[in-house]
Amino acid sequence: MIKVYNTLNKKKEEFIPLTPGEVKMYVCGPTVYNFFHIGNGRTFIVFDTIRRYFEYRGFKVDFVQNFTDIDDKMIKKANEEGTTVKKIGDTYIKEYYQDADALNIERATVNPRATEFIGEIIKFVKGLVDKGYAYEVDGDVYFSTKKFEGYGKLSGQNIEDLQSGARISVDERKKDPMDFAIWKAQKPGEPAWNSPWGMGRPGWHIECSCMAKKLLGETIDIHAGGSDLKFPHHENEIAQSEALTGEPFARYWLHSAFVNVNNEKMSKSLNNFFTAREILERYDADVIRFLMLSAHYRQQLNFSEDLLESAKASVERIYNAIGNLENLIDEVSREEMNEEEKAYLESLNKYKEKYIEKMDDDFNTADAITAIFDLIKDTNTNITIDSSKELAQKALELIRELGAPLGMFQKSTKGNLEEEIEALIAKRQQARKDRDFTLADKIRDELKDRGIVLEDTPQGVRWKMI
């Protein structure tokens, strides 16, 4: 039984899909006017992992993640660069895919662009106007929040107490400060489409509601995104969607927490961000994913070079274990398991059970990773050159099986690990000959951090995994 923390009801709930065995999931994607930063990257990695885990547990997942390709920021960027909004969108959608692929983020079932749904959006807006939930002023159309009885139920805020916030534009023409634009009249130099209210373009909130309804249906299983979208974006999506259809918009709302730098949220507005591409130039995707999944997705995560280095060492330790098993598969002479090995392999299932228990509990990736470390500690100790090829192969398959939903530990290290370790041992031996004991100790400690212990014997230096 999978339990998820539902932001809407402020508690963990058993996940029961609308259709048995299927998950309809919508995740708010990027506004494509720049490279995405690693804070956005955490959101994409988290919900990619959740999608993968549902699939691992046997669900068919319809996974929709949109591109916002018409927006104030995009218009500003296009004007600055003397190009069109469409060209900006085309460019950064391509760049998104390049970075997301590099982070081993699986492609969505559909990545809709808002501009591909203008006709549907106009119908959606008209439906709200016809029902009395929206009103037109000088070509702009606003949603009347006071008309929707449940406004504020996601964020837990009372509409009477809400004030115009930083992300809510103040406009004297609105009937209430909390009303928000679902259609915007054209301004000079802006792209626009013909509508019953004149030339204009959609508001941000209406885009996601419309695309989710069109691609997944009036009610979906999961709507997800970063916690900064909870209000007003997701609150507004609920209001306009449920006002139009009269049905619940999403049964479960999931929100990933911020990535912080120096205890402040990473954001482009604070100019304290690192793009995913910048980090990918220096660290492998497994390292970045490991860091992003090393804390529960609802916990804020601090980002620093030290934490990246720590994640790198942890990933190397797991790949060392993988490499050790790959080498054993090539080197051991006995093919099949004996009865004792079959019993030992069966005992390894406790790590899989622990992993599933933790992931079933609101996708606790941090504890799931701990279960993988416990597994490799066991295999490092008990699978040796005297073991069978079959046992080493089965253990390797189990490590990869548990790594797959996390999007990690799938690469082969064949030939690389042993050569790298032997080279470091040779370097250490030379340092000792040169009486550079500081360097020799540093190499020994570096190997130990990676789970490799050196033993000085009369026959020379030997190494083993721990």
From Swiss-Prot:
Keywords for this protein = Aminoacyl-tRNA synthetase, ATP-binding, Cytoplasm, Ligase, Metal-binding, Nucleotide-binding, Protein biosynthesis, Zinc
Task: Kindly state the positions of the motif 'KMSKS' region in this protein.
Answer: 265-269
Q: Where is the signal peptide?
A: none
Q: What is its EC number?
A: 6.1.1.16
* InterPro entries, A to Z: Cys-tRNA-ligase, Cys-tRNA-synt_Ia_DALR, Cys-tRNA/MSH_ligase, CysS_C, Rossmann-like_a/b/a_fold, tRNA-synt_1_cat_dom, tRNAsynth_Ia_anticodon-bd
Which compartments is it annotated to reside in?
Answer: Cytoplasm
What note does UniProt attach to the cofactor annotation? Binds 1 zinc ion per subunit.
Give start-end ranges for motif 'HIGH' region: 30-40
Recorded catalytic reaction(s): these are: tRNA(Cys) + L-cysteine + ATP = L-cysteinyl-tRNA(Cys) + AMP + diphosphate
HAMAP family, alphabetized: Cys_tRNA_synth (MF_00041)
Q: Write the protein's name.
A: Cysteine--tRNA ligase
Taxonomic source organism: Clostridium perfringens (strain ATCC 13124 / DSM 756 / JCM 1290 / NCIMB 6125 / NCTC 8237 / Type A)
